[in-house]
Structures are given as C-alpha cells and as structure tokens.
Amino acid sequence: MKQHVNRYLFRLFGMLLLLAVCPFSAVAADEATEEQEWRDELCQELDRLCASPLFETTQLGLCVYDLTADTMLYTVNARQRMRPASTMKLLTSITALSVLGGSHTFQTTLYHTGAVNNRVLQGDLYVVGGFDPRFGKDDLYAFAEEIKLMGVDSIAGTLYADVSFKDTLRWGEGWCWDDEAERLTPLLYQGKDCFMEQFVRALGEQGIASAGVTGQAVCPADAFYITKRAHAIDQILMPMMKESDNLYAESMFYQLAAQTGVPYASARQAVNYIRSLIRELGYDADLYRIADGSGLSLYTYLTPELEIAFLRYAYQHNPIFTHLYPSLPIAGRDGTLKSRMKRGKAYKNVRAKTGSVSAVASLAGYAQASNDHMLAFCIINQGLVKLKSGRDFQDAVCEVLCR
C-alpha cells in the first residue's frame, strides 16, 4: 500500500512539474519563432533592396550585426576593401577612446625662461602646442592675463611656438589638392594656423609690449611653467562625429601618435595603434590600408566587416560606448543626419557616422530594431555618379533595420 502511495505521489509531482514548465517552454518557443521570423523578414527586405539596378553599375558593401544576439545577420561583399570616407572616423575615435581613455584632454601649455625685473621679462615665452582644435579667444586671452599677473609689462625675448607635438607635414597622406582641408599644426587658434600672430595681438591688448619677434623652438626642459588650457576629449569628439569635422579627427589621430612620447610624432605612429586594435579584434592588419584619421585620404581602404568589428568592440566596452554613442549623428535630428530619415521607423532610432568623398557614400553605426535589439551596420556605396542614390539606399536599409 505504501509503495502504491509513493508511486502515485511521484506521478502527481511529475505532472505538476510538467504543467509548471510547459507554459515557459511554450513562451520560449514562441519567442524563438518570432525572432526567426523577424530575421527572415529583415533579410528578405534587404535582399529586395540589394536587387536594385543601382548595383549593376556601382559597388556595394553591406554588413549588419545583431549586437543583442551577438550574431551576424546579413552581408554583401562584407570583406571587399573599399574607401570608407568619413566612417574612418569611427576607427579613429574608438581606438583613441580605448588607448587614451575618456578623461584625456587636449592641452596647450605656456612656459617662460629668464626672470622678471622691473616688470620686464628678461627671457622668452614658449607656447607648447598639443593640437587642440578648440583653442579659441578665451583661451588665448587667459594666457595673456596670466602673463600680466606675473607683473610683466614688457617681454625682452622671443615668443616661441613649440610645434614638436607632431611632424611637420601640413596635410595628410593621399589628400587631394582641392579638399580645402585646414593645415595640420599643433598650435591652432580657432582652428586656423595663425596662433602666434593672434598671441602677439592678445598681449598688446593686455598692455604687454613685445618686439613681436616670433619663432619655432622646442621648449627647454628647465623652462618655468605659467599655465595651460585644456579641452576634454568629448569636446573634440562631438564636432568630429556629429559634424564630421576633419581637423578634429586629425587632432584625435595625432593624440594617438603622441602617446609614443617621440617628438614630431608621425601619422604612421598613430596608424600603428589602430593596427594594434585590428589585430586584437582577430583580424590581419596587413589586409587593410590606413593613411589618416579622417577618411579624406585616397589611400585608405577598409571593409564593412572590419568596421562592424570596431562597432561591436565599442558596444561591448562601456567606457568607450558611453562617449562614442552620444557623439554620433541622430537620424532626422542633428549633425550630418539632420536632414535624412526625418520620418518613418529610422527617425531617432539610428545613430551613425556618415561619409562622402568623390563617388563614395558611406554610413556606419547603430540602429534600434522594433524588437529592441541593438544592431550594428556598415554600408559603403562606391562608384556613384550621384551620391544621393547611395544615400537613399542607405536610408532605406536603415528603415528596414528599425522595423
């Protein structure tokens, strides 16, 4: 009798357990089915877009990755090397945030030699450039005011610019003569190569006389510190990404180069940091060509797959993502995407870096799908006669991703 009761209780417990588990299993099965249907529908829609006659005469590279599920969703020519245009700024910014960190600052520092006698500085001034593209009027006049506070009415020596932060090349490798890019110099005033001229003027407005003699020299190790002005990395990152500012991108690029501690650091040293991260992500750095930090160069060639790898890396590293994501243009709202995707599902649900050079339009970043999955995508259209045709295709892809 006791065995009968035990057997009955065991069967009853099993039935109750099955009833308890089955609803959850059914829900999980339903969710899995919905996920598969979503993926199938997304891929079918992308297939339809990629069947456009546009690609009979142009080249397409497309890669879509589901960051939430950590799986590849869709690819077309994802390993074909193409010109990234300004989506190169993604690799520059992600590498910089990885190497420099979110607390890095862009600094310009003021030093002097000699001593102050009878309100005359019997020595020289040195402005040490740190390639800060945001250095402006307030910063310059703060320098002049600090000198005035030293009790200086006159400078007997020379005003030196220390531009040893980077090499002496004024433009990037492979830039076109008609790009109209700003000159690359470690000492900038409002983004222009006119620092020392404006510094002499600011000193004069503070009542500090000088002979106006300027030159270039490396600041002596025993020079006396006066003050510095600095801007946070986010202050550089926002214009670089939102407005695709090439000068800001090259400044970020050369911050990497300067980490070597070598005077007159070159673009090659910055490239080595990016190549190092490429290898860390499991790719062969020799399969790609990187010439600058902005994407202006004719010599830079990447793949959509590699850009996705960088976007995935940033997403998985919160100290990077918390700086990168807010800096990206928002579809239909701001930056270089302000006038694109102003309606539909993609509106406000896409944050991505745009790119355009002759015959090339690109777009890479993040899209929030309707099922709350975060997607990373990279689209490169190459061989375009009219860039608008590529951008229209990209916007259509984003609309599909956000459905």
Predicted features by range, described:
Residues T57-Q59, N77-R79, A85-M88, S103-T105, ...:
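Extracytoplasmic
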Residues Y189-Y325:
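A small/polar active-site loop signature that marks catalytic segments
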Residues M1-Q36:
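Bacterial Sec-dependent N-terminal signal peptides
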Residues D70, P84-G102, L159, Q198-F199, ...:
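Active-site SXXK
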Residues T105-D167, W175-E182:
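Active-site-adjacent, His/Asp/Glu-enriched structural segments that form or flank metal-binding
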Residues G61-Y65, L73-T75, D124-V128, T158-D162, ...:
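Soluble periplasmic/extracytoplasmic beta-strand elements of cell-envelope proteins
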Residues A26-T68, Y74-R81, F143-M150, R403:
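Beta-lactamase-like hydrolase cores
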Residues R289-R403:
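C-terminal soluble interaction/assembly domains
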